[in-house]
């Protein structure tokens, strides 16, 4: 075995080390052959056109003969003689083809003989899009360039890169020189011009501004740190943009091939393209953007059935927390970096590849090619930063070849026990000649394999993969050279985002108590793991040799089946009754718990009784045996409210005394003292002690509210909030009296200044109360009207700043919510418990939606208007797509940023114990379920709502949040 491996190594070296001249000759010969094939194809096409013309002429002659046959005999004889004399050259062809003309089909010429389908996979920013663009330029069927699109995109990349550097300098608490502050404002205003589809009016002046900002010592420090810190990294090739800024801003600028390849244009969908190499057609499908995660690879085989896989690995991203902390000399930057975890993209890519090797996509593919993307940055990094910081067992020092070999073995070790041909290639994807040299051999080998398997039909929507003309084909390629050693899996798999799990579990709760005030709210939860029922299976599906066993020593699990949510957040302006919407709207519930299953806990007492267990007809009667006779009489009456029964044992005792509310009152005085702190803090000074009471139909709620707010690591505090336990007592209301108590809570997270959020603090709820819809009792429409009116007021008074917002209106037992941007609200709902004596657990119910520019639905809305999402931001600048203010994005007919809110309406029950409103400074670091559990624990410890809010904000700060943090907690005490 060792001899064979040694021979394979030797043969591989001999194959991979030809002289440069011989390579050039081979390439020249290949080009000549390709040109000859193109000439032959053109000649065949011309012959085909001549055949078509001849067939048309023959058909015309037949029609003429038919017309002549109906004329007089004398005239027909003359005409037939004339026709015979004038068409002697075509008479033979007409007579010979007359009988078979209708049965003979004209041959269709193809530009290819064989074909294949390739899926390009890899981790984030590994070079997948770069590879696909390079292959399109080298072998593409059509010209991939769109000059106007890429000119605008590259212009946006250049501006977005500088804006990102400026924002990161603020995050790191380092200030640019005073001379550049005015230039910063001019640069930050340019995305607005881009939104209006205009290039800069004074391009040379803008280029000079960009040059001065780029050469600032602070920006250079941020750029150098971004190369090793994933938290402040700028996607794409920032240095390339900066070096070419004067060319980009030239009015006569036309993008080059390298400009197009270097342009960063994140797509969250599968990117498809077709190439042809020596009459071998390849359909490429690249998974970029959000599709880079392994959880999104589950349905790829069912939908595309790729024959081969290209897995791209970026070698330059191997930095760890310790390396970042020790390599930077700026104490301010080091302090900031200690507050967040640095992603090691190389290890993440290794984990993703291990997950891939245990998936159906890998098992059904014919071969896999590992593409190690070096680029110039890797060779620069390996000289400065030892790979040992990432892999403790590495002993190769700063030698690039040893480092590449070591990393390659880390990946190929997962393939050693797999019955799968594979091969690794080291390529600089930015070097067109290097890409051509490597992929000439790759496509030559793939063409041979496709020819053996008989893949002649290209990919289309009906067959989903090239179809073999041979049928069942059991031939397999031999294993490619493999020198890797099996090592047990040492790296933990990527944990699924808890936030995504929370949203995906909304279908698990069938007892919907939340309704929505608009028929176009985000409600669809669409699975991406569906199969194509009409797809035609390729020959590889019938190959029994594809079954592979997972390595028993691996620590990774199989690729999980997940679902992704695609939602719509547009709202309608028409008024709808909540009673009509109750049947059409769904509740966004996070967690599993189904209230209708609560009576099932009665079954445990049956188990110790063996004679009664095998009797199925007696199952509905057991409730009468373990409980007194009075309880079965109460159950038929209270079947509509099962949530109230699983409460602690004290509740049935209290149910016998419904007319005695004096027992819970001793616990209320301390709660009133806690809320008094809040009433004196934010616009609730008018609220008295009785304002905490909130009555409902058949029940009463005692409210306890509080807030916690931190400036955090930002230079300014741009958050504001409102707590009004008694809304009607705090505002001037001229409408009909409201007999039911109403409370209002809100958080406004400003950006670009404090003007907008400060103005929203007294404005939104006043607009809400003074609207006609509020007087009529249509609170859903009142929220829409209030948000629109408040936005108009803000736009008139605030030029540059903006703000997100989340609001909650509690009317009796109904909770109305609205939000724009990434400020959110979560309701804590008690889960049904089979054991009444057991602890109460809560599930988070998400009552808001994140309107980010990176969201699929929001991105579609913006791009349909002609907008651009660069670096997951609106024109590279604004992170949210819905907000108050942000005047520059709302001017003109095309409003790229809007203030239409996402709304929910919830009928609260005794199972709902508290809700949390907060800005993204909390939710970016704390998951929904974590926040609910945190509040639950502190309530048990007897802490007030204010204390809990402050502790929760501090917890987010300790986790490394660099934003302002504002948290509101409202506790619902039911009587």
UniProtKB/Swiss-Prot annotation:
Q: Could you name the Gene Ontology cellular component terms for this entry?
A: cytosol; membrane; plasma membrane; ruffle
What are the PPM-type phosphatase domain coordinates in residue numbering?
704-972
* Catalytic activity as recorded in UniProt: O-phospho-L-seryl-[protein] + H2O = L-seryl-[protein] + phosphate; O-phospho-L-threonyl-[protein] + H2O = L-threonyl-[protein] + phosphate
Q: Which UniProt keywords apply?
A: Cell membrane, Coiled coil, Cytoplasm, GTP-binding, Hydrolase, Magnesium, Manganese, Membrane, Metal-binding, Nucleotide-binding, Protein phosphatase, Transducer
**Region G3 motif, annotated ranges:** 282-291
The record ties this protein, via PROSITE patterns, to: G_ALPHA, PPM_1, PPM_2
Give binding positions for Mn(2+) 1: 749-750
Bias (Basic and acidic residues) occurs at 8-17, 595-688
Looking at the record, which segments are called G4 motif? 369-376
* Gene3D superfamilies (UniProt xref): GI Alpha 1, domain 2-like (1.10.400.10), P-loop containing nucleotide triphosphate hydrolases (3.40.50.300), PPM-type phosphatase domain (3.60.40.10)
Control of this protein's activity is summarized as: Inhibited by 50 mM NaF (sodium fluoride).
Describe what happens without this gene: Morphological arrest at the mound stage and a defect in cell-type differentiation. Instead of going through morphogenesis, after 16 hours of development, the mounds disaggregate to form smaller aggregates that eventually produce abnormal looking finger-like structures.
> What highest taxon heads this organism's lineage?
Eukaryota
The Swiss-Prot or TrEMBL record lists the needed cofactor(s) as: Mg(2+); Mn(2+)
Outline the segment boundaries, as ranges, of region: G2 motif.
Answer: 259-267
GO-annotated molecular function: G-protein beta/gamma-subunit complex binding; GTP binding; GTPase activity; magnesium ion binding; protein serine/threonine phosphatase activity
Q: Where is this region: G5 motif?
A: 427-432
Domain G-alpha as annotated: residue spans: 114-458
User: What is annotated about its quaternary structure and interactions?
Assistant: G proteins are composed of 3 units; alpha, beta and gamma. The alpha chain contains the guanine nucleotide binding site.
Q: Which family does it belong to?
A: In the N-terminal section; belongs to the G-alpha family.
Record function comment:
Involved in cell-type differentiation and morphogenesis. Dephosphorylates casein; in vitro. May also be involved as modulators or transducers in various transmembrane signaling systems.
The protein in question is named Protein spalten
- Which organism encodes this protein? Dictyostelium discoideum (Social amoeba)
